[in-house]
């Protein structure tokens, strides 16, 4: 018998000890605690549905989840459970806890945050609604300041209505609190380190924001109404006053310097959104290191309409850019100016969601709904929004729920289509009146204070109006409007071409590109020493490298732009073993400029709009957008029509954006055969845009360099035919780059003088025949 057989027998396990039975009353207590905890979480989650948001009295929808019986508990149960058992040791009972949470979540701030993407964000909201640093009420002096601002807002609208009867102004009345909200955004952003705030908005309330937030002189606004002020002094078509932009250097109440910009925009609602993002991205660049950005330095604020926000697809397209590496701006503050009607269309016919803001939830954006008749809640909401952006670098949305006191414009009769709503509005006190009454009740102001603020604003506006009537017509304008196109030397010394070419073909020793690609790139080294052989992709790389070497930064984006839609660019190399990337154009020795290239999302309108905004704010950068093969440029037609071709005439604004439009007649069907050259030629009839159809790589090389260094900025549209990219007969020689220049028309070296004479005679004969007819 082996020793193992003599082992001691395994002892029989004794029964596991059982937990002591919980007395029935303890089980009831546990049930109460669980039910109350679920109820308290429901207040946080669904409390926004119980907030009175409509100034006109429509009751909130409520939610069954806010009823005690949903959790099998009663008011008495709330009294029986201590606050400590629920995680609130400083509160006596569960009822005290519930009342505290109701005060925070169902009173005046309707907050939606449980859909946010991280636990950290959700916990942040729980903390700020427990503490009072961000949600604290306004101090008496702050309340008086809000009264002063509301008096200025309402006073301007009333004065314009009286002085310029029948003129459109797209009044802010009903959402007046937007102005103190923007005051808060500027103040808090500057305190967080911003030196610039850039704003985009449509026509509603724009005149008030221009004057009362950006500081546009009111006398200038009055002169525009009188027809005595032309911001372009006859140099262009100009635009209606509620489309114009403005820039100003201001100082916050705390003494911090701040540059504030309102971006000009067309009537096409929301299409300015990506333009704002691109402008902000450009201005966030570090002045000393072009690859570094300070997202705290520039804060974008995007103001939307309640009908356009869910209705216009550009909103979602722009949201999708928010966290992409090529487009992030560190968060945007969004405000929906929600007057609960789209021209004459009711919400039931303009969206398929409960709230106008629901689209934002799909992008994990926190939302606060506020009643526009409660300026204090509006200011607190903006305070929270700026703090959230500063903390997380993400977008935040405020839904400002108000009304529109007049029709779509002041000449419109809204009672035709919304008779009941406008009966309520006619009998509803203004935001300023309600706020003044509240301050009187609270003892913060006297009736004389409230009336005095109103009279002071009216008297000031009357003085400005009288002065504007006799002031000379403004004579300042865009002196550079007719700036001529200057000659640019686009050739590059052959030794520099060889140097940058070698840099383009150099990568780290440990880096392994695809072997087939290495063979293609090696050919680029060989052709620099031989006659002919430079193709389009090679010429582009040399153009970019030489532009960078001359101190101009480059930004190129588009669908599949890194590789190139025809696999001709390969600006970004990939290591076949590790997947790591290497961008040779970012390693040109001795350059202080930056090369940025990004594959864009599958969007044309938003991405082109973004690049347009970037190009406006970064005149020292060659900015390019490349369409995907398939004639997809027409998807971005609003950006082309309203910004690229018309910005100079309407707003005196310049862009040097380059559009690269790959296409060709290779039997690929009607969707891949035309970049619509004829449309661009029509749009460029006033020399507001440059259009080129290069037929060889050298032409492409020179036109890119000319665009990079041309002082007179215009958009450049470049047709890029697919069939010529690698065509042997269309290749260029190295000396075409070092000795040549861009040719508006390429002469045919094979033509004969005799043929030219015959052609001229034929032309003259045809002209005579036409004249005789």
Locate each region found by the language model.
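Conserved phosphate-handling catalytic cores of large alpha/beta enzymes
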Residues: 342-353, 361-397, 402-406
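Flexible, glycine-rich loop/tail regions that form catalytic "lids" or insertion modules at the edges
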Residues: 21, 31-41, 48-77, 217, ...
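Short, small-residue-biased leader/transition segments that mark boundaries at the very start
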Residues: 1-3, 755-761, 765
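Active-site cores of enzymes that catalyze phosphoryl transfer or operate on phosphate-rich substrates
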Residues: 134-156, 227-289, 584, 710-753
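Extended, charge-enriched "interface" segments that sit outside catalytic cores
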Residues: 6-177, 194
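Alpha-helix capping and helix-loop boundary segments enriched in small/acidic/polar residues
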Residues: 27, 169-176, 259-270, 288, ...
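Active-site pocket-lining segments that scaffold enzyme catalytic pockets across diverse folds
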Residues: 155, 159-219, 522-525, 534-548, ...
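Cofactor-binding active-site loop characterized by glycine-rich and histidine/acidic residues
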Residues: 195-368, 566-618
């Amino acid at each position: 018998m082996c020793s193992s057989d003599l082992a001691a027998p395994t002892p029989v396990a004794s029964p596991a000890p059982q937990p002591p039975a919980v007395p029935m009353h303890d089980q009831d207590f546990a049930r109460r605690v669980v039910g109350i905890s679920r109820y308290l979480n429901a207040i946080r989650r669904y409390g926004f549905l119980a907030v009175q948001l409509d100034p006109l009295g429509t009751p909130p929808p409520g939610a069954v989840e806010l009823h005690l019986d949903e959790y099998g508990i009663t008011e008495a149960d709330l009294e029986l459970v201590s606050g400590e058992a629920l995680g609130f040791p400083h509160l006596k009972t569960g009822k005290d806890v519930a009342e505290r949470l109701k005060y925070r979540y169902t009173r005046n701030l309707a907050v939606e945050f449980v859909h946010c993407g991280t636990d950290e964000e959700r916990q942040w909201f729980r903390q700020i609604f427990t503490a009072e640093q961000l949600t604290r009420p306004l101090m008496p002096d702050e309340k008086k300041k809000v009264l002063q601002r509301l008096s200025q807002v309402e006073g301007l609208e009333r004065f314009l209505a009286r002085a310029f009867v029948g003129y459109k102004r797209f009044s802010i009345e009903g959402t007046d609190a937007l102005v103190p909200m923007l005051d808060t955004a500027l103040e808090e952003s500057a305190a967080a380190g911003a030196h610039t705030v850039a704003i985009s908005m449509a026509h509603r309330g724009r005149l008030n924001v221009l004057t009362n937030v950006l500081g546009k002189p009111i006398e200038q606004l009055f002169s525009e109404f009188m027809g005595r002020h032309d911001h372009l002094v006859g140099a262009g078509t100009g635009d209606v006053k509620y489309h114009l932009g403005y820039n100003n250097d201001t100082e916050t109440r705390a003494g911090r310097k701040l540059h504030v910009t309102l971006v000009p925009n067309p009537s096409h609602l929301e299409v300015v959104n990506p333009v704002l993002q691109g402008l902000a991205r450009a201005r966030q660049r570090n002045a000393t290191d072009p690859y570094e950005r300070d997202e705290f330095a520039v804060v974008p604020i995007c103001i939307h309409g309640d009908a356009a926000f869910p209705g216009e697809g550009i909103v979602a397209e722009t949201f999708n850019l928010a966290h992409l590496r090529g487009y992030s701006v560190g968060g945007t503050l969004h405000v929906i100016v929600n007057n609960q009607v789209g021209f004459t269309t009711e919400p039931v016919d303009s969206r398929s969601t409960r709230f106008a803001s629901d689209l934002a939830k799909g992008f994990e954006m926190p939302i606060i709904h506020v009643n526009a008749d409660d300026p204090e809640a509006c200011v607190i909401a903006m305070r929270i929004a700026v703090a959230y952006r500063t903390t997380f670098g993400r977008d935040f949305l405020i839904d400002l729920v108000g009304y529109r006191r007049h029709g779509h414009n002041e000449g419109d009769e809204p009672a035709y289509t919304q008779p009941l709503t406008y009966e309520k509005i006619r009998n509803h006190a203004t935001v300023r009146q309600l706020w003044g009454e509240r301050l009187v009740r609270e003892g913060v102001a006297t009736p004389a204070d409230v009336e005095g603020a109103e009279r002071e604003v009216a008297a000031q506006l009357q003085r400005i109006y009288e002065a504007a009537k006799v002031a000379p017509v403004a004579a300042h304008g865009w002196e550079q409007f007719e700036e001529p196109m200057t000659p640019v030397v686009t050739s590059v010394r052959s030794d520099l071409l060889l140097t940058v070419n070698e840099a383009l073909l150099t990568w780290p020793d440990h880096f392994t590109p695809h072997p087939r690609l290495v063979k293609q790139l090696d050919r680029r080294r060989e052709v620099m020493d031989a006659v002919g052989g430079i193709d389009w992709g090679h010429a582009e790389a040399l153009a970019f490298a030489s532009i960078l070497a001359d101190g101009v930064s480059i930004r190129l984006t588009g669908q599949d732009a890194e590789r190139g839609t025809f696999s001709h660019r390969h600006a970004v190399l990939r290591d076949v073993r590790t997947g790591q990337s290497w961008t040779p154009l970012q390693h040109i020795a001795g350059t202080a400029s930056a090369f940025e290239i990004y594959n864009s999302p599958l969007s044309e309108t938003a991405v082109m709009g973004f690049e347009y905004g970037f190009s406006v704010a970064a005149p020292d950068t060659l900015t390019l957008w490349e369409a995907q093969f398939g004639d997809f440029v027409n998807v971005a037609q609003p950006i082309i029509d309203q910004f690229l071709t018309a910005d100079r005439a309407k707003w005196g604004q310049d862009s040097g954006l380059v559009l690269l439009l790959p296409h060709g007649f290779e039997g690929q069907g009607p969707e891949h055969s035309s970049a619509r050259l004829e449309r661009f030629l029509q749009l460029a009839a006033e020399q507001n845009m440059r259009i080129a159809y290069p037929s060889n790589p050298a032409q492409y090389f020179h036109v890119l360099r000319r665009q990079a260094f041309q002082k007179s900025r215009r958009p450049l549209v470049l047709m890029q035919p697919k069939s010529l990219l690698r065509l042997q007969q269309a290749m260029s020689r190295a000396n075409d780059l070092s000795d040549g220049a861009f040719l508006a028309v390429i002469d045919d070296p094979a033509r004969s003088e005799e043929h030219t004479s015959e052609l001229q005679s034929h032309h003259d004969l045809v002209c005579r025949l036409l004249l005789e007819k």
